[in-house]
Amino acid sequence: MGTSSEVSLAHHRDIFHYYVSLKTFFEVTGENRDRSNSTRAQKARAKLLKLSSSQFYELSTDVSDELQRRIGEDANQPDYLLPKANFHMKRNQARQKLANLSQTRFNDLLDDILFEIKRRGFDKDLDAPRPPLPQPMKQEVSKDSDDTARTSTNSSSVTQVAPNVSVQPSLVIPKMASIDWSSEEEEEEQVKEKPNEPEGKQTSMDEKKEAKPALNPIVTDSDLPDSQVLARDITSMARTPTTTHKNYWDVNDSPIIKVDKDIDNEKGPEQLKSPEVQRAENNNPNSEMEDKVKELTDLNSDLHLQIEDLNAKLASLTSEKEKEKKEEKEEKEKEKNLKINYTIDESFQKELLSLNSQIGELSIENENLKQKISEFELHQKKNDNHNDLKITDGFISKYSSADGLIPAQYILNANNLIIQFTTRLSAVPIGDSTAISHQIGEELFQILSQLSNLISQLLLSADLLQYKDQVILLKASLSHAITSIRYFSVYGPVLIPKITVQAAVSEVCFAMCNLIDSAKIKSDSNGESTTSNEGNRQVLEYSSPTATTPMTPTFPSTSGINMKKGFINPRKPASFLNDVEEEESPVKPLKITQKAINSPIIRPSSSNGVPTTSRKPSGTGLFSLMIDSSIAKNSSHKEDNDKYVSPIKAVTSASNSASSNISEIPKLTLPPQAKIGTVIPPSENQVPNIKIENTEEDNKRSDITNEISVKPTSSIADKLKQFEQSSEKKSSPKENPIAKEEMDSKPKLSNKFITSMNDVSTDDSSSDGNENDDADDDDDFTYMALKQTMKREGSKIEKNNDSKLPANIVELDLHESPESVKIESPESIKEITSSEMSSEMPSSSLPKRLVEDVEPSEMPEKGASVESVRKKNFQEPLGNVESPDMTQKVKSLGMTGKAVGPESDSRVESPGMTGQIKSLNMAGKVVGPEADSRVESPGMKEQIKSLGMTGKITAQESIKSPEAARKLASSGEVDKIESPRMVRESESLEAVGNTIPSNMTVKMESPNLKGNTVSEPQEIRRDIASSEPIENVDPPKVLKKIVFPKAVNRTGSPKSVEKTPSSATLKKSGLPEPNSQIVSPELAKNSPLAPIKKNVELRETNKPHTETITSVEPTNKDANTSWRDADLNRTIKREEEDEDFDRVNHNIQITGAYTKTGKIDYHKIPVDRKAKSEAEVHTSEEDIDESNNVNGKRADAQIHITERKHAFVNPTENSQVKKTSHSPFLNSKPVQYENSESNGGINNHIKIKNTGETTAHDEKHYSDDDDSSYQFVPMKHEEQEQEQNRSEEEESEDDDEEEEDSDFDVDTFDIENPDNTLSELLLYLEHQTMDVISTIQSLLTSIKKPQVTKGNLRGESNAINQVIGQMVDATSISMEQSRNANLKKHGDWVVQSLRDCSRRMTILCQLTGDGILAKEKSDQDYADKNFKQRLAGIAFDVAKCTKELVKTVEEASLKDEINYLNSKLK
């Protein structure tokens, strides 16, 4: 080849390998395509053509390397060809650039290189043997040799004959052809022609040539005609592709030269012929030629046929031979495999047999070992089970307590059972055999039944409401474990994995741990705890079933008190029942409601004695949905179905008979250490000593009253017995028939009720023993401070009783009175004051005491006779005391020792003490039984006539406080002292001397008094926590006198007073309308009960109310006192703003709780009638105007219920209680009675002195550590009294204003009216706040329910949203007024916060601004946790903002009032 000189064999081989790889690449990828017509390809190939052999070798090497890099499967190969040190730098760069070519361009490069390799002839493998044929080449060689022989033999003749004509063209043509062709390219063309031929044909030709080489000489050019040879050559040229340019390196190889040679060869023989032959041939030229042609064609055809036949035979022979060879090979391989397999099979079989034998032996040994292991495990487990666990001392010390409830043995037994259970469960085999699972299920059930029995015993010792959650969890866990075992035994371990049962038992363990952590383990040394715990459990039975607040498990040790036989001491139950909050809802009450919750208002009950529902879903009152535990206790009754079990047992037959008529017996808590001071009724004219003892933790005892004619050391049991006997005597026939009739018509309360009232007051240890656990009590420290303060007050009062207190006032310290216990809330104080103070009090004893205690200095100042003083004093007690005994005894309290007519009747309003002691006939005259004091109400102008004066006058007094209303029993009751004033009045009763007959009784208006038969409106009020009407309850027969500070004034819900209860409500309450009268018809006519306006609107808000001085003062009044009182009122308000309801700061500062009676002409009020205490009950001048008429002129007494008090409906009349602005603290504004004293012209100014006030001054000196906010007004100084008089004068001037407040009607309030005053706005906001808070509480209760729907929550949220919108609008309009700049400063952001709450609620609940609740598809779905949490958060924000809004408006209103008062003082 021509390239052999330039390219070495090694390079040739390399290029050939490159050619193979490139060709293989295109065959595999199918990328090869014809690019001969592409101009781009032609240019590229032209450049390759210019490359030298070495350059082309390098290029083909680089392209091949790049191809290998691209198709390589090595993941770690580089992204380009790495440079090589032996390569030139530019070549390395060019190699790297190849990696940048796209696949299409790179394929084009490969195609061009492949083309150039073919063109240059490097596509031949030099190592491969050359094919024996190429036929054409051999023929040409033979032909050439023949030609040369011919030419050599004939050369002479040719040259001799003539120049060959064809020589010239043969020489010319090669010259021209040399430009295009070369001999080397011709050879390459011939070589390339063969691959272009069909492969089958080519292979067949090769086979023929190899099989029969002898045939090759047959087909030669010499044997063929020249024309055929030329035709063949031409066809071979035509077969070569025209697209490929053939370059022939040797010019002699050109086909044109070959044609010329053929022509010369054909002409040579013709020229050699002799002339004779030529002539002959010329003669027959055509025939000869035709014959030759035919012969040759025939021969050619025969030869072709022979060749085809031979080729076919050759192909068949070769195929057969190959088959035979294959068969032989297969047979040989089979033979080899058979031999190998045979040998392998034999060896394997031997090994397999040996292994099988070994396996058998090992399996037997393994089974034996497993059996032994299982036996050892079972043995070990049995040993472990026999080893009972013992609780170590460390464990005992950690989880045990002196008050622990759970015996340690229970825990050990439970632990052993659980271990036994889990051990048996772990032994359960994993299988699907139901028989096995049933058997195991039985065993597990047996173990679990023992565990269940043990847990039930454990719960008996610890099942207190305090641990209700832990108990419920333990019961639920046990139930879940039982269910798991049931399913496990039924479905087996296949469907129910053992882990489910194990988890269920684990839950039981966890629940037990929770209970142990809470209830603690009972140590072995504490053997007495079992009995105490059992007692506690029985106590729990008396608690309301709906109580959800946990009860305290431990109770303070109580000193044994010898009570009357059959009297069940309710101290223990009360001590923890007082902490029980009877609510159906487990929702934690809002702090805004806790203030009212802590007031012990007796709940209403239906006529059948069954308590009404403890809450309404959305009440009309502010705190109607929140019931305090004390409320629940005090209001719970003994139901027919024993649902509520009263802890108090009736003792005497009288009490039992009376109990049948009692519609409601409050369940009150008695301090465990309190001793009940009983009043021993003396003879008719004898005044029994009233001694109230209180043994607290310090065992402090004090005689509250100066003991006069009674043994102070008489035991409580004796006093109770004597008192009951006296009550029985009073109900004897010797008494006035009218009084007797009253006694019969009224239910009698025995010790049962006394103890129940004692329950109201709770001792520190009982009520607060476990308050540390109560997270809701934020005021524990303040509360304790108040208790200490009150204790000190009691001691000081006892010491300074004679010197500091007016003679007519009997001081009772909260801690000195048997009933006085730590009162946790104003409500509890009211409860005590109402129930205990309303305890029956022998009137005779009181007047005598009062007379003896009268200070001589006071009388000269007053310029009044002793009788007048007595009368005054008597007026006070009359207002305070109401009981059948009092009715019987104090029948005619002629202050001169004469019977006082019923007009001396006084009306007391406890919370504010706004109640008026009706004008007692203080004329010093005997008030005949017919002495009339008219009770005038818009609805009832009937005169309540006094009872037949068989020495008895029932001064009727309507108790207006919430408790008073409840406590007012039927006519048999002693006047109830409902508040500090009532207490003070009752105290003053004792001051009334011996002149008062013992048979005279001051009777407070029973709830049922109305007109002559006063059957119509029973005084019905609503609890703070309940919207249900509360019936009046008969007070106990024992008079317990407790002076409570003004905190008693706090009242319950705004709805606490119902508007003019009708007789129907009386019937519902269970009190007979006529029978429940306190007074006979005469007394009803004569009784000076003042009309109470029917519409009562009590402001109840969270904010403290400034206590206004409401009592009417005599003419000699000091302005200083009024100013001081006003300051005190402000101070009280400030303090109360930050105090919860349970704070008894009122107890220390009782300032302005004055009972004002109607319009007073001060010129008619004697100077000597000046009241001694701030909590004075003044009969108005109108009352006094007609007091000269002893025979029964009637005066119209109008009760004006002040802004802070609950107006209580006068049960004796269809009285209309004016709606007054009400706040939680019933700061009494004047109650104005248009009251006439028919028996005396003496102006009855009854001042009730509050012990809290009297001790206030001392409190300042002795209790510096107490809350500085408690301010006290010492009552012993005349200057202070004068100041009080002045303040009362100012209060009288403000009566009209306050009357307007009492007439406020929220329904008529115009939100858009810019002229609304702050006072009106405050009233409106307070009313609206009531509705908002009640609805919020209902909403929170609903949220707590797991199955509440979203629609229900949206409905309540919509109601809240509408009310807040109205509140915001009303406040915004008021803030826009320039006169209310003070409100806008602080109220702006409060209103904005409320708006934000409304917006959030609107978005969350998808509400509309118009208040129409559109139905949503999701209303029927259960509310999800996220929705509930967000809604609860918004509700709490609303409650907080509404509280703040009311407080803000009240502060602004107070500032205006202060400015007004300052202007008046100036």
UniProtKB/Swiss-Prot annotation:
Pfam family, one: GIT1_C
Localization: Cell tip
Compositionally biased spans, kind Low complexity: 543-559, 831-848
GO BP annotation list: bipolar cellular bud site selection; budding cell apical bud growth; cellular hyperosmotic response; cellular response to acidic pH; establishment of cell polarity; establishment or maintenance of actin cytoskeleton polarity; invasive filamentous growth; pseudohyphal growth
Annotated positions of the Phosphothreonine modification: T220, T1179, T1251
GO molecular function: MAP-kinase scaffold activity
Reported function: Involved in pheromone-induced morphogenesis and efficient mating, perhaps as a cytoskeletal protein.
Subunit record text: Interacts with SHS1.
Designated name of the protein: Protein SPA2
Species of provenance: Saccharomyces cerevisiae (strain ATCC 204508 / S288c)
